[in-house]
Structure formats: structure tokens, C-alpha cells
Amino acid sequence: MPNNQQNQIESPSKNTSNVGGSTLLNNNSPPFKSNGNLNSIPNGFNFLSSTSFHGGFGSLFSPDYAFNEQASSITSNSNLNILNNDSFDKNFGQSFFNSFSSLGSFNQTQQQKEALLSFQNSYLQQQQKDQQQKEQQKEQQKEQQQQEEQEQQQKEQQPNESNTTTTTTTTTTAVEQQGAEQQDTNLNSTSSPTMMTDVVFNTNDHVDFASANNNVMVTSSPISSSLNNSQDNTKPVSPDNIENTSNPMDTSSSNGKTPTITPIVTPITTPVVTPSSTPLSTPLSTPLSTPLSTPVAPIFNSPTTSTSSTHSNTSTPITVSIINNNNNNNSNSNNNNNNNNNNNNNNTNNTTTTTTTATTTSGGKTNPTGKKTSLKQGWTKEEHIRFLNGIQIHGKGAWKEIAQFVGTRTPTQIQSHAQKYYLRQKQETKNKRSIHDLSLQDLIDDNLNNSNKNNVDKNKQDDKEKKTQKTKKTKSKSSTKGDEEMITQQQQLQQQPQQQPQQKQPPTIITNFNTTPTSSQSSPKSNSPSSPSSPQSFQSSQTEQVVGKLFSPFYRANDGDDSNVRHIPKSFLNNNNSNNNNSNINGINNNNGNGNGNMDMNSNNINSFGNNEGNILRHQNSHQIPPPPPPPIQHVQYQMDFQRQYLPHHTPQPPPPPPIQQMAPIFPIYNGSNIHDINGNNHNNNNNNNNNINNGWIQSPININSQMQPQIHQQFPQNFYQYNPYSAPPPTLQ
């Protein structure tokens, strides 16, 4: 045992504070003493983030760390520093016992110290025993290989008997059970993480050790060795890790003991062929790039010994049982050479850390380049729940983050799944609504679709009539076909409903859902309002679109007569995705800039001001700038904008307002936006005093482009210097 560890365990602590009386051996000691004063422990010590906590983490594993019943009163005092002593300055990376010896600062007795010393000595002795056992195993393996080589040479000298057949049974199950028992015994002897990492278990070592003790020949074929190596992550598949044994047909032992034979899982008879001349390192030096569902017979044809010896050509049946504890779905290798085993060697339950091992794809096939082509089928419930949670966390559009959250889908798959999901959800909500809950827009869209179908059918009918008239003189067959098509189209037109919308009463639109043809609809060439030639139909279709937009539940505004339709403010519905991009008419969270009421049809923006100041400025501007001659409402800005945007044929476009020569109203402007907006540069600069220099506004020289200074000019209006913004630049401060 090292001397430094013994000195650390037997040396007393530098700190005089006795922390946590032992519940095991010293129950009479008080729970906490710090020179009789609890306030002597420094305040504000965050032991979770301190280096001393991570350095002396081993002391938390001690049995002396448990408090007795008297220590429950100490939890109320949050200033206690349990781990503030010198022993926690030890580094956790030295050894486990260096950090474990920090228990010397606690209230330890001589019995505890002796127990720790004996525990450490037993651990060191156990390590020496393990090393000796490993050396003995290696020596026994060498001796066994030499004996097997001699026996094989003797058998080669004997004459080949054609009718002799020997069967060998692999005892992998018994060997794995013995290996598991030895792992349990070794794990019970160790009680710390570092101890467990010192003792490394290899399944091949246990296989050879068991075979050496029981004198049982184990045929370590590439399949069984690779399956055993899949349990051990520390060893890659290489010829060094696969124990090369001798002739697999040999069941006789040198000592004459009978081998222990386990039940055969699946007996398969394969003829033994002479091994190929290629060395064993060529197929196994690389990671297992071909799946295990490849033909089995060539794998057994590969040499299983390091010596270049040839087997007999006699067909001897070999019974091989391949067992993988982590895979119950492994189909045993058969002589069908069938590559289409779906459940063949899909290592989904293996806890392997190397991702370069063979990954079988659909049908048990892999690309020759080694790239995995995962063909994933439908979405599971778990994936869909993770998809919905990812949307709630990251939001729509963050497909990469949601893909990382789901874990089994690519961002493109998640995007397509989201599109399908929202379309299906929209269709379900539309089907749930009754006809009374449908908005007027939906009803009008249905009617427009029907009228558009009628127009398209009528155009097709006219084209067919022209074609039939041209070809009637030359070809009679084509004319008869055209007449038949005309008759069928006329019958379709009679069955489809037609509607004459009421133009003067848009709130009370009555849709005609009659499917039976009427007398007025029987003549196909009558001047119906749905025909494209009449100007009334064009105007009616325009008014239908206008009425549909004005009377949708997101607008609720008509041509100016508020008596027909109840006016609902837009902020009541809180819809920020309307067709007009006018989120919240009342100026709340309005990020669209179109200052001083420029009545522009092409701009969907209303207001260039941020929060509630825009509401004030909008009404101020609408009072200052008189509206054009026939405005329906003179003080509501969005009504005027709606009429100019959606009703271009009702009201003429107003001329641009003349420049205002009077002062703007004096009140604080917080976002520095332009009231008059000379050039119309709508940069949407809301609540930002520094980015609107290019906004066509000659800004006040106070706090120009200074992001760190206090916003002094917010206390004053923009026209603090009493100047006309159209005449001259403001005076500069000296």
C-alpha cells in the first residue's frame, strides 16, 4: 500500500470543526460543532459550484456522512457549510482512495480507520489475484493450442475416412453463464466506480478460461465471436480479439475427460469445404461492414486456425448454435442462403457505442459503400407526441430543433408531417362546424367556385362548338362526337346550381343551393349573370369578392352604413394574420409603418408608430389632414384605407395632401418615427431611436446615432427647435 495514502488516512484534520457525528459508532457526539458558534462558518458558500465539492466528491460515499436524529434541526440553518474543510482540496482524478481518505476530517474512530485500511488492502490483493489469474489463463491457452496443433498434425497423417462423421456442439451458453457468474463475483468484490473500471471483463477471456478448465473445444467462428464481441464495447472486431482455435471437429480431450454438452439450439448440417487461401485478417480487420444475413456456408469455410492447415474434404455435419443474449429476434443461420430475413441481426437492443458496426436496413441489405439508407415507415404515437411537444417548445418553422427533439426524423420529414397535420386539423375543424357557424366568406367562396366552374364549362363548350363547325364539312364522325359532348356538358350545366347575387344588400346574401334545374336555367345560351360576356356579371363577381372580404369575421366593415352590420373592433378577435396585415386596429403591437395617412393602394401598412402612441398620432393626423371629398367616415383611418384598397371603383383616388406649413402637435414621440414621412421610406422602426436616419426624416441633433447615451430627447418633442421640417435643417448644437 502506498505510504501517502496511509498518512492521509491516519493524519488528523487541519480544521477543528467536527462535522456530522457518526451514526455508526459515535452516537453521543453532538451533530455539528464549530468552536461553539454556528456563525463561524462563512456565508454564501455554494458548494455545488465550488471546486472543493468536485475535488472531494469521494467523501459523499463514506458511511460517516450519514447524520443522526439530532441533525434534523440543522437543516433550518442554510448557512451551514458541510463540506468546507481542507480535505476537499484533494483532486478527484488522483485515485479513489485519495478522495476517500478525506474522511479523516470527519469524526472518525480508530476502528473506522482500521476498517478502511483493511478494505484498501483487500482491494489491492484482489487486483494482484486477478492479474495472476489472467496470466494463468494465457499460459493454459498456449498449452491447449500446442496440444491441439499436435493432435491435428497426427490426424492429418492418418488416412482420410470418407464415412466417418463427427459432430461438435458449441458450449457457448454454458461458457456465457460461467462468465456471467465470474462477473458477479468480481463485481461483489469491488465497491467503487474506479474499482469496477479497473476490472475489465472480456467474454472471450471467459470462454477460453472455461474451455481450459473443462477441456471443452469451443469453435470460435467469426459469427459467434462477433456476436460475443457485440456485448463487449471495449473490443472492436479484429483477428486479435477472436481466439483462433483448432479443428472444429475435435471433441476428444487430451486428458480423457468428457466434454460438457449443452442443448443444441438449431442443428444445421453444412459440408466442410477446404478453407480458402486468403488470410483471416482480410475479412475481419475492418469493422463488420457486411450484414450477418449473408450466406452462412462461406463463413464456416473461412479458416478458424492461424496455421495454414487443410481440413478433410469429407462432408461432416456441423451443429452450430449461435446465441446472442441481447437479440431474441436473431434468426439462426440456415443453409438457405436467404438474404431477405427481416428480423435478421437488427441490433436494436445492443448497447454498443461504436456506430461503425454493421447496420442492416430494410430487407437485411446494406449498400456496398457502407452508407445506411433508412426507409422509415409511418409515424408512431410517441414520435407524434414528441413532435407536438417540440412545436410547443421551439415553435413552427424550427424544423431542425424539432428534429433533434424527436430524434428519429429528419427536418424535411418533420416539415412534411407538420403540413399534413395542419391540413388535416383544418379540415377536421371545418367539418365540425355547422352551416350556421360558417362565415360569410366560406359561403361566398363556395358560390364563386360554382360560378367559376360554370364559366369554364361554358368556355369549353364554345370552343368545342367552333371546332365542330370547322370539321363538320369534312368529318362526320368528329361532329357526332362533338354533339354528344355538347349534350353531356349542357346536362351538367343544368344540374349545377346558378346564383344571382344581390348587390345592394351585401349583409343578407341568399345563396341558391337548389340542385334541380329550373325553367330559366334550361336554355344554355341565355344571358345568365354568370356568362363572361355581360358586364353585369363582371361587376357582380367583383362585388362578391369585396363583400366576402369586408364581411368576413376578421373585418366586419361595410361600405359605410353601420346600421346593417354590427361593428366589432379588430382587437377583439386578436387576429394578427389578416389579409390586410393590420394587426390590431387600436394600435397595440402594430408593427406596420405607413405614416401621415398616405392613402396608397399598394401599401398594406397603416401606422408607422409603435404601441399606443400610434393610435394618438393616427387620429391627430386624420384631424389635421382633411380627407377627400366623399369620405364615409372622417375620423376612422382604417375605414378610409379599406375603401381605397378593396373598393377602387366606388371612390376615386384622392390627390396627395399638400405639405403642412403648421407645427405638428407637441407631445412626446418615443420611437422617433416620421410623422410626415417625406420619401415614404417605411422601415418599420418601432421603439428604436437610432435606426431611422435613412427614413427621410431630418432628425434632431440630440443623441444622433448614440446607442449608449441616455435617451434625453424622449422628454422633448421632435420639433423642439421650432422649425419647419420641409424648409431647412435644424440648428446644430455647439
Curated annotation (Swiss-Prot):
InterPro entries (UniProt xref): Homeodomain-like_sf (IPR009057), Myb_dom (IPR017930), Myb_dom_plants (IPR006447), Plant_Stress_Dev_TF (IPR052245), SANT/Myb (IPR001005), SANT_dom (IPR017884)
Annotated region described as Disordered, given as residue ranges: 1-35, 128-196, 221-378, 445-623
GO biological process assignments: regulation of DNA-templated transcription
Composition skew (Basic and acidic residues), residue ranges: 131-142, 455-468
Annotated coiled-coil segments of the chain: none
Cellular component GO terms, alphabetical: nucleus
Annotated GO MF terms: DNA binding
Start and end residues of each HTH myb-type domain: 371-426
Keyword set, alphabetical order: DNA-binding, Nucleus, Transcription, Transcription regulation
UniProt DNA-binding residue ranges: 399-422
Name the UniProt record assigns to this protein: Myb-like protein J
Annotated source species: Dictyostelium discoideum (Social amoeba)
Record gene name: mybJ
